[in-house]
UniProtKB/Swiss-Prot annotation:
<feature type="region of interest" description="Disordered">
    <location>
        <begin position="212"/>
        <end position="239"/>
    </location>
</feature>
<dbReference type="InterPro" id="IPR002580">
    <property type="entry name" value="Herpes_UL24"/>
</dbReference>
<dbReference type="GO" id="GO:0044177">
    <property type="term" value="C:host cell Golgi apparatus"/>
</dbReference>
<feature type="compositionally biased region" description="Basic and acidic residues">
    <location>
        <begin position="229"/>
        <end position="239"/>
    </location>
</feature>
<comment type="similarity">
    <text>Belongs to the herpesviridae UL24 family.</text>
</comment>
<keyword id="KW-0426">Late protein</keyword>
<dbReference type="GO" id="GO:0044196">
    <property type="term" value="C:host cell nucleolus"/>
</dbReference>
<dbReference type="Pfam" id="PF01646">
    <property type="entry name" value="Herpes_UL24"/>
</dbReference>
<keyword id="KW-1040">Host Golgi apparatus</keyword>
<keyword id="KW-0946">Virion</keyword>
<comment type="function">
    <text>May participate in nuclear egress of viral particles. Plays a role in the dispersal of several host nucleolar proteins including NCL/nucleolin and NPM1. Since deletion of host NCL/nucleolin negatively impact on nuclear egress, UL24 supposedly acts on this process through its effect on host nucleoli.</text>
</comment>
<keyword id="KW-1048">Host nucleus</keyword>
<protein>
    <recommendedName>
        <fullName>Protein UL24 homolog</fullName>
    </recommendedName>
</protein>
<keyword id="KW-1035">Host cytoplasm</keyword>
<dbReference type="GO" id="GO:0044423">
    <property type="term" value="C:virion component"/>
</dbReference>
Amino acid sequence: MSLEYLPPVRRRIGQYNHLRIYKKILLLKSNFEKLNFFLGNLFPEELHDSKIHVYFEVRLGCRIPDCIIVFRHFGEKLLKTFHCYFFEFKTTFAKSNLFSIQKNRTQKIQYLQGLRQLRQATDYLQQFVIKNESLCKVNPVICFFRQHGLKLDFVKTFIAKELQLSSTFLCNLFTKYQNDTVKSILSISNPTNFRRACQKYSNLYRGRYATTPKLGNSKTSKRKRRNSKKQDFKKLVKN
């Protein structure tokens, strides 16, 4: 099942809104309550004091999850459990819910594609399992946001996988393979410049600030037209 039937501009708008979601997550990263609320209150309270690492569009084999959030526990000693959330974000023009996802063709395809992306991305981590390492709880999550106002309409969390993984290795892996262009865009602090960069990256940039090339000197064009009329008149007189 594919969304190829959608006009290209619809897909570009979706990409643009993904960048807006990423930026919002970064802005809320330091506030556990607000970040948790924005993403549907899916983080347990026990993660409140954990160190948060956020990565966007990390290439894991043939899959690129939209966002990965890692919670690492630090205290007098490193606890033997850490949490890793894999997110797939879907944006819609209309409101989405469980019923609309079942009945609406586009939303249903978005949901199924998200499931496949999450399953294959989390399966990719299996190759890095190390015996007697920390226990990593890998939580796949799919979120449907409304494009207007980035309102979260629907969120679904799936059964977590428990894998023995090195948190340090995993964070280094995600850092290495995340999208550097997206990371650069998200580092822009000025709202206007950030919006323009998002539009340009998504091919929605209208070139509002670009200079329009001149077609030619208007005086020269007028002179050519006058000379042409004179030549036509002379031909008529001769005939």
